[in-house]
């Protein structure tokens, strides 16, 4: 994956600045897609992971998959995500409402599932059905999982 990164605080934090950080990051990244070598077209990703231990700050990478290494455009970085099993959820509706889907995953589904979060990065998956402000928009949110107790 190759893209632009930022740090932010999520909706569950008193320091929530998601709305100030992520839309401008995507606004900078999308016009620069043509600068990235070896892209796999059709899907962009948002990669969400803790910024470090013992912090509620999160690190976010707005990115696209690449088929192989190439020169990194200025200010961009490459990231490889190890293979993992993911639980994938569909979010329908405007992007501004995705927090409801994420809250469901973490406060309902994960608590009753036989799996647990494997502590890898979460993925936002933006394909051709994604239209940020449309009520008909579709995107996916995926969390890495492992069987509970492992």
Residue positions per predicted region:
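A solvent-exposed interaction/effector surface
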Residues: 1-150
């Amino acid at each position: 994956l190759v893209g632009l990164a930022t740090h932010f605080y999520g909706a569950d934090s008193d320091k929530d600045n998601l709305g100030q950080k992520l839309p401008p990051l995507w606004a900078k990244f999308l016009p620069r897609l043509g600068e990235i070598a070896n892209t796999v077209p059709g899907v962009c990703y948002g990669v969400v992971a803790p910024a470090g231990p013992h912090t509620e700050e999160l690190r976010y990478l707005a990115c696209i998959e690449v088929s192989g290494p190439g020169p990194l455009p200025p200010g961009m970085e490459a990231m490889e995500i190890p293979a993992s099993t993911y639980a994938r959820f569909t979010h329908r509706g405007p992007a501004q409402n995705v927090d409801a889907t994420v809250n469901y995953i973490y406060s309902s589904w994960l608590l009753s599932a036989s799996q647990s979060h494997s502590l890898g990065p979460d993925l936002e998956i933006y394909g051709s059905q994604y239209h940020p402000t449309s009520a008909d928009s579709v995107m996916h949110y995926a969390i890495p999982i492992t069987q509970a107790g492992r």
